[in-house]
Amino acid sequence: TNAQDGVSSVQTAEGALTEVHSMLQRMNELAVQAANGTNAESDRQAIQDEIDQLTTEIDRVAETTKFNEIYLLKGDKGTKTINLEAHDAGLKGTLTNNGDGTATFTMDAIKTGDKVAIGGKTYTIGSTVDEAKALIKAPATGTVDVQIGDKTFKIDNTGKVMDADGNQLYVETKDGQTAAATFSATSNLTTTQKFNNDQGVATDNRAVSVDNLKSYVKGGVTVKVGTESATAMTDVAGAADGVDDNDVTLITKQKAYELAGKELLAANSIGDTEGHASVKNGDDTDLAFDKGDGSFKINVAQAKVANTLSFNLHVGSDADLTNKIQVNIDTMNSDFLGIKGLNVKDENGSAATYAVDAIADAVAKVSSQRSALGAVQNRLEHTIDNLDNVVENT
């Protein structure tokens, strides 16, 4: 009967998709393996070779699976452009898919001293020397602990500077003259102060000040005040490139935004056969080390695919249109699944990590199509049972 033919056609398509599903699961295993940092270049190449073969086989299954000369998984005549899913590249923040081929991503707030993971690497957000100095100040109430490099101090709410044990610090001149006459406000501190007040000089002129402490701060020094911290970058002027001269993991906040934008582009370019993917700052400016505020505009990847195959199964004995059951099957090639040209070969495994997300999207598409076909098959089986019942009792 027509209904039985319908069941057979749906089972043919669903059986082929079972194999596609299995291949995607294997690709996921390979991508996870490639994301591990222990792989040598030859290992990743071997993994890439297998992924390429699996992608080719998925395309072959989509191209050749047919029932009664009807190709079930290659779509229908004509083409359409589809938007692929947006991805956050593993960054901490909020991703919003706008549904129109664009998405927005806003990073969680970052501040000086924070550790930020971008593209498989961990960076510390640095500051200028002046920004680090600005942390050193008297608290509104009580006392605050201050660490400058390897030196520890306390400052109370009156601005009094003390050592770690709470003893007030004083400047003692080498020649016994009064501090007021010989001390320059921010240049005479040594690395091992043991200040005292045994010279008989007025303490108001000799007490160490908050400004004196700030003189310790220079490029490469970390300042911790209470729960806040800042590492002064060695290229004080905000950096010609946003990266510390002596430590490539110490970067400015704006440099972090630039790097994040580049990773967003890498994650959202997978499967982009139409060249649509792009990432800009939230204010629509291009990514740069001295721009950005942590918000991004994403044009998602796009692919051109065949139109959805649609056909009707006529399961009744009369011409009533309610006797028709519609079957819709999307093309299931690598373009539609968003895995065309999938790459896992970069050095730090971030490409493989992004590939895992792309494969997950592909699995979701196959699962959705299998679910739809399963629903049609169940309906057809009930239809057949009811037709048998009508014949038997008529």
Regions found by a protein language model. Give the residues of each.
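Primary detection of the long, small/polar-rich alpha-helical "axial" segments characteristic
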Residues: T1-T394
